Swiss-Prot record:
Its main location: membrane. The chain crosses the membrane at residues 6-26, 36-56, 64-84, 88-108. One of its GO terms (biological process) is spermidine transmembrane transport. One of its GO terms (molecular function) is antiporter activity. Catalyzes the excretion of spermidine. This is Spermidine export protein MdtI.
Amino acid sequence: MSQVELQHILWLLLAIGLEIIANIWLKFSDGFRRPVYGVASLAAVLAAFSALGQAVEGIDLAVAYALWGGFGIAATVAAGWIMFGQRLNRKGWAGLGLLLVGMVIIKLA
């Protein structure tokens, strides 16, 4: 799969966006005490996996999954910081940095 088409990249971007939305809605669900957000979160995860399934038709699985997971985590950290005032400590930032370095290495492999 050397030829990655724009449609597969767009599917991957959609999967990443849905993953982020699912995580935010999961936080809003307050441990499923607010079931509308909980159910919406589950639906967003299902949609994210469906979009990822379309993306891997044109992007190698390891690359697509690493990008999906890595960008999803990084953006969720940012959303937690901006929306909920959650902060990472030094170890958390180091882990996020290692994750991003790992994504680059996988992409270059």
